[in-house]
Amino acid sequence: MITYLGMSAPMAVFALISWLRHPYQGNRSQVQVNQITRNEVLCMLLLTGAVTLLFYFILRYFHTANLLPSTISVTTSFLAVYLTFRRSPWFALAYGANDAVLIVLWTLAARQDPSYLSVVVCFVMFLVNDLYGFYSWCRMAKRQAEATPDAA
């Protein structure tokens, strides 16, 4: 809950604002796909490292079960919301990575209580959806690049 309130929710608000401010050719039904630079990737990775370290200690303080996979979930979640904010197609793969981590976490829980298997199935479907989302965003980026004469 702390990760969602302290990280995911604020980043989702920033992402919404970013998407509303960058419609594709003025068409509010489609966002302008963004390509991030190598320098931005470096900044993103440094920020991700800092957030991961911070939340590791927060999760450890609260005696979180499965501390390592839970921390990795924070990492992938932060990458996903950052890339969503930046309008990069890679956000979908980051969410997919987060789904994979959550599949592991819920599978561990399901070993103790089989009723959690339904949650595992749910995250498997989220993973499929995120993979399709990445494919769709790549197609949209290609269409936008072909339609824009000065696109790189």
Predicted segment positions?
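Membrane-proximal helix-loop-helix units in multi-pass membrane proteins
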Residues: 18-76
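Hydrophobic core segments of alpha-helical transmembrane domains in multi-pass membrane proteins
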Residues: 3-11, 70-76, 96-99, 118-127
